[in-house]
Amino acid sequence: MESASLAAGDVVHFKRGSAFSGNIRISESGTAAKPIRLTSYGKGDLPKFTNPTTRDASGNALILGGDYLIVENLHFHDTPGERVSGMIIMTRLAALRIERGADHCIIRNNEFIKTGQGIMSAGEHTLITENYLDGPSYALWRTSKSSWGPMGIHLNIGNQEVSYNTIKNFGTKDSPWGSDGGAIEIDYGKYHKKNIYIHHNYSEGNAGFIESSWDYDWPPYRQEIHNWRVSFNVCYDGQSWLFMLAPCTGIYFDNNTIARYNGFGRAQNAGARIDVRGGKPIGKASGAHFRNNLFIYSSSPYTGNRSSGALKTANWYSKYKSPGIKYKGDGSQAGSGDPGLVDLEKQDYRLKADSPLRGKAVNLSEFYESDFDGHPLPKTGNWDIGAIQYNAAKPNKALQPKRRSPYL
């Protein structure tokens, strides 16, 4: 692969059942009409890729350095790792890394197992979709007062889309913070953080779903965040669902189902943490807007120094095992109490026919077309609250992938 010369429209086939160790870098570019594609062929387990040491290309098993590249149906595993420097974690560490300037790449239908960071992307107009990521529980680095990671998907820049992925078990349980890591992290202050769309993902057992950093970036530049949509995700994690540190402008969290009643061994178990540290005026959080979300919580649906300033519309709040408690922190809420789900304890978040969430959400059809299960959203009339709209029929197949390979 290192010596192969690729051209637009080429397809590189890796045999199923094969294994590769070390680094591969693709520097050539495809075009919009003729992308270069890396895929698998044959029968059996997906082709396996690893790089066991940061001394070789910072531990990257695959680096994309060109435009219009597609990576699909590959398996990445056991990339570094513990005791990695903060600079490498911020800028280079991942099983699969998209370099700055490598734009219009697609990462789809792959597996990432026990990777300290699964995917890192500094490329714009990237699509990361339908991947299965199952992470480790160790910190990438730690001191007596701090630690960092692991992370499933690490975005270094804006203009990216993360959709229909399954992300599980990225996070520590013994960090000085209580726990650290998470499903998706958006930082590296050198590049802008505009136009990010995160939707229809399933996360479970992570130390949080999304974090946007501020003072903790490397280099220590600060990037405010603009024009994000985080919608129709189902999140059953520990730690905070969100940890928003950067000042927000036009940031929307719509129709998510947030289940925070199992800490997964972690000390913190809050919902949305809005702890904005910068901006003018300092800490203003009115650019964050929560609409049509279902919060199932054991501690609090919101926390942080600016959470009360975030805008809230038509959300529902359910205190775990205390359905009679009305949440008092949202005067515009759709309601509080038992949400009427099919089976909360078995993580079946579909609505029963008599669920009070039905018809209580505002219609956002100008932005969205389908719910978490792929059912079309009504063009007119009120919606249901949460990621899954009521439907009498159980979906035939989940849109978010399950693990295909039994090994490792």
Question: What residue ranges belong to the model's regions?
Answer:
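Acidic Gly/Asp/Thr-rich repetitive segments characteristic of extracellular carbohydrate-active
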Residues: 1-21, 25, 355, 373, ...
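Right-handed parallel beta-helix/beta-spiral solenoid domain characteristic of secreted/periplasmic
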Residues: 13-14, 20, 29-90, 335-339
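Extracellular beta-strand/beta-solenoid scaffold signature
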Residues: 25, 51-62, 84-99, 113-120, ...
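Parallel beta-helix/beta-solenoid
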Residues: 7, 15, 28, 33, ...
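Residues on the solvent-exposed faces and adjacent turns
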Residues: 16, 28, 40-42, 51, ...
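Predominantly extracellular beta-rich ligand-binding scaffolds that present long acidic/polar faces
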Residues: 22, 27, 57, 200-203, ...
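C-terminal accessory segments
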Residues: 331-392, 396
